[in-house]
């Protein structure tokens, strides 16, 4: 099948970024290209339109990769989405719809259904597009997971996909990681690995060249290029690993503190705030981090009651109360909004074992979780402007008399709560909100234009630093025969 698998030496090696960059570069050549990830484990997701106009849910990274490919996002691009609610339990989204829960103890019992669905989705995309660029997960050399793999080499074997391995040289040890990744694969899997891409290189490329030549010599595989480290190159993140890379506060700007909840979800909601020139966005997990904030955001979460208990245990509830008492603005989004209400009920254990918990009482609303997940793309009025967003939640909101309506949520003075993810990506709503809460004037920032510039920048870097023609030929025609075997192979 025409396609390519982008595997990585580790998590966060650059698979999502490289996949998006290849999609943009191939699309520029007139190729009808689609992104794909068989299984994504992330609480950052997006709603797109499914059959009949119904909402379907996919990983945020695949949604952005579809934008890079100039393709319409769809459930087949991320057929299995796992949303961790605890260290041992994940909510499963199958072809965009809620499927159920899987615990680590019964993971292998449900794996075959997920694998079959994922491989059918890939085959469907491959039949409709010229090339499918598939992103792997973690590393293909996780020998403890090999038997159940359908995301990395399991997918590559299914579709006979040539595979490239990307490694983050900024972490160090990339040559050992490249060699070791291949050397732990079986003979059959090694035959599908065509070569490497080095990611996040800083410095003089001439100093790296001898190492690249040696890597090609000892592995018998091509290095397709080296992507430079670039400070402005960040895309919608897949998981919380990327939170550590957010910029720190600088003097003079209004400080926005985002509560870093243990099961934080859709933290891309604040990306648009990070582009505003008069704001500095930081993530905080203790009261000191919230103390001097001009605006606090409590984001979404996959475990609302559990994260509310964590928030109280760390004294963050008192910090939020003090912030509101000082007349400063507070915004809660989805699960964060539900925490600001009077009570949260989960009688059926949708999110966890605790059936009921008192909220912070800052908004006159109550939340009750139901089994059916709401997936919507709402549009309406807020703060005098047209706004839009997306909803992904099990919670049903009941508002009291004191609650003033705000974007599917409620407002009381400077305390705002909304069920709409992504509303701040709308320039008009964001400007109105910042004017209302912080007194800021319009900056002229366009979030959608900024995202498109980043995708173009990524495409430019891929075109400039990688052998795109060779990668496209690889995707169309597959690996060269008789690639050398690196011992010891699969244990």
Curated annotation (Swiss-Prot):
Q: Which residues form the active site?
A: 334 (nucleophile), 421
Which domain of life, per UniProt? Bacteria
Q: Which GO terms describe its biological process?
A: cobalamin biosynthetic process
Write down a Pfam family by its short name: CbiA
Any single GO molecular-function term of the entry would be: catalytic activity
Q: What Gene3D superfamilies would the database entry show?
A: 3.40.50.880, P-loop containing nucleotide triphosphate hydrolases
Which terms are listed as keywords in the entry? Answer: Cobalamin biosynthesis, Glutamine amidotransferase
Q: Where is the GATase cobBQ-type domain?
A: 253-429
Q: Does the keyword Calcium apply?
A: no
Pathway(s) it belongs to: Cofactor biosynthesis; adenosylcobalamin biosynthesis
Task: Quote the InterPro entries the UniProt record gives.
Answer: Class_I_gatase-like, CobQ/CobB/MinD/ParA_Nub-bd_dom, CobQ_GATase1, CobQ_N, CobQ_synth, GATase_3, P-loop_NTPase
- Function in brief: Catalyzes amidations at positions B, D, E, and G on adenosylcobyrinic A,C-diamide. NH(2) groups are provided by glutamine, and one molecule of ATP is hydrogenolyzed for each amidation.
Which family is annotated?
Belongs to the CobB/CobQ family. CobQ subfamily.
Q: What is this protein called?
A: Cobyric acid synthase
Organism, as annotated: Mycobacterium ulcerans (strain Agy99)
